[in-house]
């Protein structure tokens, strides 16, 4: 049985870890570029061309669309999305919450797919909401362009 002291220690440690993640935020957009470069090809499997010169450009345009979509959200929602990307970009929380042990550029499509499926079907609503946010941002940015229809 967890004691009150253990509960408080765990809460403080978790809060400290999240604050460290915010302080360690990369200079660019909170690590979103690196995370999105890894997630977009996995989430858009079947829609993106498998190979070819167009693939990197389509990923970059989708990432740009995600950034535009985030910029159009309410400030409170932008903050929550920023916290989601902080969680995924900061190595200790990425490892614990997503189970991705290698840096995003080195993560395999299978590992990323497993992470996404685990969040999609999680028993925790917070993880399901995180998956839904990633899904909606990426698919919204992809299908907002007429050339993807």
Language-model region placement:
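Ser/Thr/Pro/Gly-rich low-complexity linker/stalk segments immediately outside membranes or between
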Residues: 26-29
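Short, functional C-terminal segments
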Residues: 144-149
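N-terminal secretory signal peptides and thylakoid transit peptides that target proteins
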Residues: 1-18
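Flexible, low-complexity segments enriched for small/polar residues
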Residues: 31-141
């Amino acid at each position: 049985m967890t004691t009150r002291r253990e509960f408080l220690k765990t809460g403080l440690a978790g809060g400290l870890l999240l604050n460290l993640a915010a302080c360690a935020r990369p200079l660019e957009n909170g690590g979103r570029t690196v995370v999105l470069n890894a997630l977009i090809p996995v989430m858009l499997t079947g829609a993106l061309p498998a190979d070819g010169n167009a693939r990197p450009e389509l990923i970059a345009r989708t990432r740009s669309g995600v950034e535009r979509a985030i910029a159009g959200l309410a400030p409170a929602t932008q903050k929550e999305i920023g916290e989601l990307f902080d969680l995924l970009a900061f190595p200790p929380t990425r490892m614990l919450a997503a189970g991705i042990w290698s840096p995003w550029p080195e993560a395999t499509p299978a590992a990323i797919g497993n992470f996404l499926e685990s969040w999609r079907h999680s028993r925790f609503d917070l993880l399901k909401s995180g998956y839904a946010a990633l899904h909606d941002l990426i698919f919204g940015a992809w299908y907002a362009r007429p050339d993807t229809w």
